Amino acid sequence: MDPQGALVQVSPACERLSGYSQDEFLADPKLMERIVHPDDRPRFEQHIAHSHAAGRLLEGEIDFRIIARDGGEHWIAHTCAAMIDPSGSYLGRAACNMDVSRYKLAEEALLRLNRELVATRDCASATLRATDEQKLLRDTCRIVCNAAGYLMAWVGIVERDECKTVRPVAWSGVEDGYLSSANITWADSERGRGPTGTAARTGETVVLDDYASDPEGQPWRARAFQRGYRSSIAIPLRGPAGDAYAVLTIYADRAHAFARSTTRLLEELAEDLSLGIESLRAGSKLDSA
């Protein structure tokens, strides 16, 4: 960039990353600004403004996302520094933009895994202290949302009635009336083939990766989108005989949120919860005997 902030040279590598050519960047001084992710644009603009104002005094670093021509999202590590000629005159600024998307994704995955480990630990602690089943279910849902960062969690009892109802008994997070209108069943019907109904019917964990495209989520798609749900996982709570008597269902605000490592941790959490419920019920029977 020259001292006024206009681009004078751009690396050919910019096209491989952004989809826009050298000529396009040089012809449109605002192109770089426009392709910065909207959530990161204020920070980027502030950085550029400070860089120009400070001139030779500022060396800067900032991470931000860009939206490429094809719609792909990339994390950029940006560094810039002043260029000074031998006489001490300020010539402008040189900047380097490096694609660090893989590192950012790995960092985010590690942070999520750590949150889930904390949630698993906190749920285990709540289970050990529990004296009331309903409170344990509520506490588990709350911890899953608050500690692990999920959008909503609920537990539904698998009723053995004619309609094969899954009855919500505890929840936390962004629910906003979703459960009262979901009409989830574990029958082999349209409203029983989503994650919760299938987990109740089969006794196996079920993941719905993307409410936007997975056909199993179609009956709830509009209501899910209104609340920000993009993917979900349903984990059966199994009794001693192995049959599902309840289901823990969790919703995330992004698609494909439930990787294998995440699923394993959440299954451990559900298993601990199930053992806690069995222990409380066994104690209740002894008290009433």
Segments from the language model and where they lie:
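Regulatory sensory and allosteric helical modules in signal-transduction proteins
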Residues: P42-Q46, V166-V169, D176-P215, P219
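PAS/PAS-like sensory domain cap-loop motif
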Residues: Q4, C14-L26, G177-S180
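GAF sensory/regulatory domain recognition
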Residues: V8, H74, R142-C145, W154-A187, ...
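PAS-associated C-terminal cap
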Residues: D39, D85-S89, A95-R115, A119, ...
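Short loop/turn elements at sensory-signaling interfaces that couple input to output
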Residues: D2-Q4, A77-A95, E162, A241-A244, ...
